[in-house]
């Protein structure tokens, strides 16, 4: 019996992982092609080149030799583990990455001591984070009782969302949030429905240990999710409210204790960081009517399917527990997005940044998946009353917008196909119907990703040749600095040099400078 159970679960895991790898390859296909053929680096020309890759190289060089956490080369000298805790220094996934790189360096496959190695690692790690995101999200929707078809569609909508690319491209360490959120919710649900608390403890401990800012974001959304599940019970819950209260709080305390090193390091780094807002910068209350902030077309930070609108307006489906939950979350995020103060709150009450869009990506994806799952409970008239106005507005936007977004057309096609399925009860041809829906959803996401790439990724891309330019990593300057370092070996010796572009030149050229950029 146990052997049969293990075999079935292990088999399912490998199948899900295999599908996740395929979806990830599709998701990153254009970026893989651009990197191999054109040498286009999957990292932002700003923070990616100036911070992400130099920080990774610096951390690897110090962690591989188990050097002291205080190092003279970190600015004017400092605790690099604490100083880079906002980025990668406390990420267990990055530690595993460093271990693999060390093995490769030992056997002579890799040369991570030069900045030219790290663009390849940047792309590979982004894909690994995406694979983990797909796998964890599938298991989350499974425990939320999504049917297999709805699970697949919702997982594709989230895993192939623009946020996955945008986060991994711009601030790659933020890619960890994309799987930590569903993992934390999965942990809660496993306890509520199966009385198993282990995954929740691990997920919260990982979050607290990895990044204090992650803990801040996650505390808001997981806290709200937990309160909702505590107040409103679900039919498959097997623990009482009292048990939910006592056990989850106890598990959270255990998570805090097990992550105390990372949490203390992150909190102390946060407290020592001057986050005081520039008094000359005024944060407007209302969000500007700008394409950057659009949700359903041409969005810079995120673009989601117009199916979300129809799902939100289908109030009859709010009788389903998780449909109502994800609809409420989506409504709150939409309403909150109208104010820049909402963006500021998710960035430590400093300059407004849309760091919360990954939550919207998950809630809207779950909502769309559940809408398709419960579609057959609606009648045709009810569906059309909500769909036709959305389609008309979408068509008008396509015609009047200078970008003529193709993603809206694909979204309209999806709504029409759903109408045909509802009208003719095509769920009896389940395999064909599901295959068509999955194909259309994938096409929609690919089109959305392509549009977002042209808008939010391409303008900030650089090629491998940038790594050899005079203002980033010049061979002449490199040789000159090597000579200086040979004659000045003391830790108090400093080189006062920083290029206009490579602001973290001391990390890139391996010398003790007088500053660092973060």
Regions found by a protein language model. Give the residues of each.
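Membrane-interface micro-motifs in multi-pass membrane enzymes
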Residues: 83-86, 119-132, 155-185, 209-218, ...
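Start-transfer (signal-anchor) and selected internal transmembrane alpha helices
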Residues: 1-35
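Soluble catalytic regions of membrane-associated enzymes that act on cell-envelope
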Residues: 405, 434-518
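Contiguous transmembrane helix-bundle modules in multi-pass membrane proteins
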Residues: 214, 328-334, 347-470
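Membrane-interface coil-to-helix junctions
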Residues: 23-133, 156-168, 172-177, 271, ...
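Periplasmic/ER-lumenal interhelical loops and adjacent helix-loop junctions
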Residues: 50, 54-59, 90-98, 243-358, ...
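Transmembrane alpha-helical segments
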Residues: 133-141, 180-192, 220-228, 310-311, ...
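Membrane-embedded helix bundles of polyisoprenyl
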Residues: 125-143, 149-192, 196-232, 244-267, ...
């Amino acid at each position: 019996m146990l052997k049969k159970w293990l075999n079935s679960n292990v088999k399912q895991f490998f199948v899900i992982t295999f599908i996740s790898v395929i979806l990830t390859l599709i998701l990153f296909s254009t970026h893989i092609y651009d990197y191999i053929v054109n040498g286009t680096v999957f990292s932002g020309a700003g923070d990616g080149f100036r911070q992400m890759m130099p920080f990774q190289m610096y951390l690897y060089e110090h962690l591989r030799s188990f050097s002291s956490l205080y190092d003279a080369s970190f600015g004017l000298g400092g605790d690099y583990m604490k100083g880079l805790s906002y980025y990668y220094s406390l990420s267990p996934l990055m530690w595993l990455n460093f271990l693999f790189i060390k093995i490769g360096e030992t056997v002579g496959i890799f040369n991570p001591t030069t900045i030219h190695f790290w663009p390849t690692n940047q792309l590979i790690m982004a894909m690994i984070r995406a694979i983990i995101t797909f796998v964890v999200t599938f298991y989350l929707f499974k425990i939320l009782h999504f049917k297999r078809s709805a699970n697949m569609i919702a997982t594709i909508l989230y895993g192939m969302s623009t946020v996955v690319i945008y986060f991994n491209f711009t601030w790659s360490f933020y890619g960890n949030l994309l799987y930590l959120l569903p993992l934390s919710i999965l942990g809660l649900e496993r306890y509520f429905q199966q009385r198993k608390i282990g995954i929740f403890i691990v997920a919260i401990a990982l979050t607290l240990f990895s990044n204090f800012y992650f803990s801040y974001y996650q505390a808001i959304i997981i806290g709200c999710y937990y309160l909702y599940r505590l107040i409103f019970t679900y039919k498959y819950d097997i623990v009482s409210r009292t048990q939910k209260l006592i056990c989850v709080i106890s598990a959270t305390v255990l998570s805090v204790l097990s992550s105390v090193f990372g949490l203390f390091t992150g909190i102390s780094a946060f407290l020592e960081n001057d986050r005081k807002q520039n008094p000359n910068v005024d944060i407007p209350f209302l969000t500007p009517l700008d394409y950057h902030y659009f949700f359903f077309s041409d969005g810079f930070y995120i673009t989601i399917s117009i199916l979300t609108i129809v799902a939100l307006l289908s109030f009859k489906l709010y009788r389903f527990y998780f449909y109502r939950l994800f609809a409420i979350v989506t409504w709150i995020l939409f309403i909150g997005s109208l104010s820049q103060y909402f963006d500021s709150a998710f960035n430590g009450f400093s300059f407004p940044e849309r760091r919360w869009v990954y939550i919207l990506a998950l809630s809207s994806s779950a909502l769309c998946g559940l809408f398709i799952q419960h579609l057959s409970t609606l009648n045709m008239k009810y569906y059309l009353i909500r769909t036709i106005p959305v389609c008309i507005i979408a068509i008008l936007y396509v015609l009047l917008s200078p970008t003529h977004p193709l993603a809206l057309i694909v979204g309209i096609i999806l709504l029409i196909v759903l109408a045909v399925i509802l009208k003719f009860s095509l769920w009896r041809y389940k395999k064909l119907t599901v295959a068509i829906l999955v194909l259309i959803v994938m096409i929609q996401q690919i089109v959305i990703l392509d549009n977002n790439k042209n808008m939010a990724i391409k303008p900030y891309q650089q090629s491998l040749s940038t790594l050899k330019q005079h203002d980033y990593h010049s061979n002449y300057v490199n040789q000159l600095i090597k000579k200086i370092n040979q004659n000045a070996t003391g830790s108090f010796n400093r080189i006062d040099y920083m290029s206009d572009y490579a602001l973290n030149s001391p990390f890139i050229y391996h010398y003790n400078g007088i500053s660092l950029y973060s």
